[in-house]
A protein has these predicted regions:
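Beta-propeller domains
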Residues: 1-152
Length: 152
């Protein structure tokens, strides 16, 4: 039996009828963090000797950009599927960067995005060479010393 739990729901100010090509369809942002205890197997079976984790990092914007949007501007969300004893579990979590927390508090985008003019930034204390960009920590992940690390 599949047990689905909502872990957290982050505030999003994106419009419900958003039609930006990088925020619709398969690119549609998710603002909910989930835990699925037993993922339903649609066909076949998960081998009992399969033991491991598949993880990926994706971009999930929560707020309208200041002017222009590039997919790398979305906040990082790690998705993970854990396989053990013929069962798969799923979790997704936002990477809670300083930038994500500040924008959640303010309810708006604060830093200029990759395709924006840096002068449009509301805050200029970003982590990149431009200074006015948020490190969304959304494009890569590595495992080092038993920890999953994300990066811009």
């Amino acid at each position: 039996m599949t047990d689905v739990q909502i872990v957290d729901q982050l505030r999003s100010t994106l419009p419900a009828d958003d039609d930006h090509p990088y925020r619709t369809g398969a690119w549609r942002p998710q603002s909910t963090e989930w835990h699925v205890d037993r993922v339903e197997v649609v066909e076949g079976a998960i081998p009992h000797d399969l033991d491991g984790l598949y993880a990926r990092n994706t971009e999930n914007p929560l707020h309208q950009p200041i002017t222009r949007y590039h997919p790398f501007d979305g906040d990082g969300m790690v998705h993970a599927i854990r396989f053990r004893d013929g069962v798969a579990t799923y979790r997704n979590r936002f990477v809670r960067t300083d930038g994500l927390l500040a924008e959640q508090e303010s309810g708006t985008s604060l830093w200029a995005g990759l395709a924006e003019n840096p002068r449009h930034a509301i805050r200029t204390d970003g982590r990149t060479a431009r200074g006015s960009m948020k490190d969304a920590s959304s494009t890569d992940l590595v495992v080092h010393g038993g920890e999953v690390l994300t990066s811009f």
